Regions:
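Hydrophobic, membrane-interfacing alpha helices
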Residues: 1-351
Length: 351
């Protein structure tokens, strides 16, 4: 299969899912998957429950899609499975921890996450991960890998994962845009046909800003669509061996969009007109530019799409993906900011 055909097929496969999600997920019914009864109330006899959310399922699925993409790209470079799994676990472990710690530091809230902050930590932690892999590879007679191709793989995988993972924000109603009424006339006309409207009192946009039922800038859908579109373009460059161009396109877009998109958001992201997240993104753009200019890239590196696909179709890889999704879902899927009150009864007509 040619690289262009693979890119086209993937894009066409994702498009219907994205278009459906942009219209369906802001509805009230797409927030809670299930509720688990945990404790029975003594006063009213009702059960109190913990909610399992689509937010967790979608965020885990987006992260998994990014991990699968990264696995495919490094497999196409000839990196053995043990090396790929090690880099995924190392970088993702740092990023997942940073997603909560950075959000707590910036927003002063315990029950929140920052994907943008996690991305910065991922970019910073990958060079040590590559150095560690190469050190082990020398001892084990495994292929060595240059830094820039791996950074390109990471940046592209992040964008593709972000495109799916951002759908979680549509389900929960977080990371939401400004009301159209707060925009200037020209900007309002631009966004009006695509405005997002969220429903349900347990959506974050409702309880944090009182904007349920109000048309807002579709910032989550815009981020998702652009991330997938730019990610696919950068993926094609990667598969064609243009690693520096792929890395710069994916990384600079992801970080630059973080800076720009915040001007259209209404949710709290810390104090100041230029938020801490925007500052981190700006520093990240400089870091990525310097890395692309001076980082090592073997000009003889070639990708083999068939080898990458073959690396995915392996029991060890498949079990790893299943375990990764389950762990991420458990970590993010149990709601700490919503609750449930449950009652049970016998259906007499079925007896």
């Amino acid at each position: 299969m040619s690289n262009s055909l693979f890119t086209l097929i993937l894009g066409l496969a994702l498009l219907p899912l994205l278009l459906w999600a942009y219209t369906a997920l802001p509805r009230e019914r797409w927030q809670i998957i299930a509720a688990i009864p945990t404790q029975k109330g003594e006063a009213d006899g009702c059960w109190h429950g913990t909610n399992i959310t689509y937010y967790g399922a979608l965020l885990a699925s987006g992260s998994l899609f990014g991990a699968i993409s990264f696995f495919l790209f490094l497999g196409a470079l000839g990196v053995p499975r043990w090396g790929i799994i090690g880099m995924v676990l190392g970088v993702m472990g740092c990023s997942v921890a940073a997603a909560k710690l950075l959000a707590m530091a910036v927003e002063k809230k315990r029950n929140t996450l920052t994907v943008g902050g996690a991305a910065i930590i991922g970019l910073l932690s990958m060079p040590p991960a590559v150095a560690t892999y190469n050190s082990l590879a020398e001892r084990l007679n495994a292929p060595l890998v240059s830094l820039i191709p791996v950074m390109a793989a990471l940046a592209v995988a992040y964008l593709l994962g972000e495109g799916i993972g951002r759908l979680a924000c549509l389900s929960f109603g977080c990371c939401y845009g400004k009301p159209l009424s707060e925009l200037g006339p020209k900007t309002r006309r631009l966004f009006a046909p695509f405005a997002a409207t969220f429903h349900g009192s347990t959506k974050k946009i409702a309880y944090a800003s009182g904007l349920a039922g109000v048309g807002v800038v579709p910032i989550q859908a815009s981020t998702s669509f652009l991330s997938v579109a730019i990610g696919l373009a950068a993926m094609y460059l990667f598969l064609e061996g243009a690693f520096r161009a792929s890395f710069l396109l994916a990384a600079l877009f992801a970080l630059g969009w973080r800076i720009l998109s915040e001007y259209f958001r209404a949710d709290y992201r810390g104090e100041g007109k230029f938020s801490a997240y925007q500052q981190m993104a700006l520093l990240g753009m400089g870091y990525c530019t310097l890395l692309a200019l001076y980082g090592s890239s073997d000009t003889g590196s070639r990708t083999d799409l068939g080898a990458g696909l073959a690396a995915l179709w392996n029991p060890a890889a498949l079990l790893f993906f299943q375990a990764l999704w389950l762990l991420l879902f458990i970590y993010t899927g149990f709601s700490t900011v919503t609750g449930a009150t449950l009652t049970f009864h016998v259906r007499q007509e079925k007896i």
